[in-house]
């Protein structure tokens, strides 16, 4: 089984039927046997992006389903991971990466993902 990192963009497109990339992401998610790796920071950022009342119930249900999905490896928060992400964030002023992006990059490196 191949492991792939799922970022906020992926989840926003998956959960928002009006997103221009929804169909492509939904098709991939529905047919892939890949192990999905993500972080609680990504899930929080996804929930923030879809916090409007019309999305809230579906997003909450989806986030809860991620907890027990055997095809999902959910990386928990830790002080060490946060500090490593913050170090990357602070050190790359030439980029417009969010802190969540930087934490994701650290996880992708640790997990040897693309």
Task: Give the role of each language-model region.
Residues 12, 50, 70-71, 89-93:
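Short amphipathic alpha-helical interaction patches enriched in hydrophobic/aromatic residues
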Residues 1-38, 51-64:
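Short, well-structured N-terminal submotif of metal-dependent ribonuclease cores
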């Amino acid at each position: 089984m191949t492991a792939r990192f799922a970022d906020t963009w992926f989840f926003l497109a998956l959960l928002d039927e009006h997103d221009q990339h929804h169909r492509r992401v939904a098709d991939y998610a529905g047919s892939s046997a890949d192990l999905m790796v993500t972080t609680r920071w990504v899930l929080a950022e996804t929930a923030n992006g879809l916090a409007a009342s019309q999305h809230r119930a579906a997003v909450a249900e989806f986030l809860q389903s991620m907890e027990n999905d055997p095809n999902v490896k959910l990386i928990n928060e830790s002080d060490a991971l946060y500090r490593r992400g913050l170090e990357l964030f602070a050190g790359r002023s030439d980029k417009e990466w969010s802190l969540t992006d930087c934490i994701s990059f650290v996880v992708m490196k640790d997990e040897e993902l693309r």
